[in-house]
């Protein structure tokens, strides 16, 4: 049985276009995961993606996770509330194209509906532009993602540049 899924591709071409959300009442921090730790990437991929049909990496071997997470193009950032792991994002830097892909971004379910998604996305966009090479940050989201995902991208200043319908 196939399912019809709407996919939107969005981009932002200047950090000046970011409509940032950095007003939080929770004690939280976002930090670059150093050193790389494939177990953290795998943990978030599974726990965040479970409700949103993220399946492409479920069959990855440990060596595939290690290879991916240790790739110099990939940067993983972790959101903590107090000391709890609350969310993450993965950025892939394509310096030869002067662009960054927000490959994955999401929150652990306990931290939904607290404005943390907009805070996390604001951080992802800002960190994408810190290298003075990036001219474009892009992401894709689909109708299986969190119900507020597309609206969050649009509210942060991203623009849709492509739409498609796929069958999965």
Segments (PLM) and residue ranges:
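Acyl-donor-binding surface of acyltransferase catalytic domains
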Residues: 1-29, 34
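A conserved beta-strand-loop-helix scaffold within acyl/acetyltransferase catalytic domains
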Residues: 60, 69-76, 80-99, 103-106
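Conserved acetyl-CoA-binding loop-helix of GNAT-fold acetyltransferases
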Residues: 104-107, 113-128, 151-155
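Conserved beta-strand-loop-alpha-helix junction that forms the acyl-donor binding cleft
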Residues: 112, 138-149, 166-168
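Short amphipathic alpha-helix that is part of the acyltransferase structural core
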Residues: 22-57
